[in-house]
């Protein structure tokens, strides 16, 4: 299979690339390196530096003939999206529409979208399945929902199929240590906790300790990035075999609280990991946990590496070098 990853130099993208490479697929990566790292791109990949907002660059790379496209090129900080909506609409929505229309033009008919559990918003029941209403509580989540809706329309109007993978919280690193480059400017909880443990930042801000959860801190569904990467392989195989659309959750179906992650990190790293408890963030639900039964049924996907110990241990391996320098 010949697969092109847009945004393939980022944290998730490099793990997805590795998964395709390890089964001897041909992999191209298109990235503007705004958050990804050139050093994390495997030498076996063909790298194209470019921006999805540049239609000519997108058209040129798609003209080289690909079986499938994986779209991971998006800004993803929910809080920032509320402060800078234009940044998110331009890159996430306009950029995606350029990519989708150019895929149609180039007759690349198999499209895998990196979507998000943020499309659901505040859960009205748990675990959250794909039939749950979509009502994003931040603009980032809206951009992902907007892309999904456009894919749905394009698939009806053109000969075009897609799988939208609604990730829950991606976490962890390749367990064999093949990814060593850190994510630039991480906003997600676990890399931030690791930066505190490694001495790269003074403390962790814990937003809210008065939620209706066992320890009062927010509960999320963390899924190991190696498991997420496998989901993209299975999605590509599904598209090439079935030529049908699919929207599925990728989550571990287990909830971990901020406090659990903090305690496990302290235990595994032996570091103090200072935490400061502050007010809740607007729009943050108390608990968000996935049902991934549809992904198992349609793709044969399971979260095999997503225990809190596996996630923290694999991430700490990568951050230990930084810890030695502090």
Which residues make up each language-model segment?
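Glycine-centered small-residue hotspots that permit tight backbone geometry or close packing
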Residues: 8, 36-38, 50, 79, ...
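C-terminal substrate-binding subdomain of Rossmann-fold SDR/epimerase-dehydratase oxidoreductases
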Residues: 192, 198-326
